Regions:
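Conserved serine/cysteine hydrolase catalytic core
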Residues: 51-131
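Short, solvent-exposed loop/turn segments at secondary-structure junctions
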Residues: 7-9, 102-105, 136-138
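Active-site microenvironments that recognize anionic phosphate/pyrophosphate groups
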Residues: 36
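Helix-loop "lid/cap" segments that line or gate small-molecule binding pockets
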Residues: 40-51, 56
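Phosphate/oxyanion-binding loops and surfaces in catalytic or ligand/nucleic-acid-binding neighborhoods
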Residues: 10, 79-82, 154
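Short glycine-/acidic-enriched loop or helix-start segments at secondary-structure transitions
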Residues: 12-13, 18, 108-110, 142
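Catalytic active-site module of serine/aspartate enzymes centered on a nucleophile-bearing elbow/loop
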Residues: 123-158
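Flexible "cap/lid" loop of the alpha/beta hydrolase fold
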Residues: 2-32
Length: 158
């Protein structure tokens, strides 16, 4: 298992999920109002990733038409319950490599807490490793070369 700043079940214990705000965002997207909010479609993928200009435009079109959909809201409503189900299954004893961000970029956690939770999780795995990255949550937009290199090293050691 290779996790790019993945959310382990313990994150959801204290995560505050604002469903009314998501429903408001859904309405704003449906009505097209979301397009009037400056910079809202300027995600890390657009600002820092490797997308071409054409791909950035496609990203924005998809973002505006598929933001806060009913499916996304339903998934969010179920996420804590689903995390508890996963937690009850226990930590898998498989080779796991976690890339851990600094928690910035919308996680809702401070750096220390964001890093502490997956480090505690991976410490329960016999063949578990982690790499801390000094970048926001969407690590693949910032550290894709490091991630690629370290994944290759990890896989070749298995």
């Amino acid at each position: 298992i290779i996790g790019l700043d993945m959310a382990v079940p313990q994150y959801y214990d204290s995560m505050d999920i604002n469903i009314p705000l998501m429903k408001l965002a859904s309405w704003a997207a449906y009505m097209g109002v979301i397009r009037l909010i400056p910079g809202i479609s300027e995600s890390d993928a657009v600002k820092y990733g490797t997308l071409s200009d054409e791909e950035k435009e496609v990203y924005k079109v998809v973002f505006y038409s598929r933001t806060a959909t009913v499916t996304m809201i339903n998934e969010t409503k179920s996420v804590k319950e689903n995390a508890e189900k996963v937690n009850k299954m226990g930590v898998p004893q498989l080779p796991i490599l976690l890339f851990i961000s600094d928690g910035s970029g919308g996680t809702g956690f401070d750096k220390e807490t964001w890093r502490k939770i997956p480090i505690e999780y991976i410490s329960q795995v016999d063949d578990g490793k982690y790499i801390e990255l000094d970048c926001p949550h969407y690590v693949h937009d910032y550290e894709y070369e490091t991630i690629s290199e370290r994944i290759r090293e990890f896989l070749s050691s298995q």
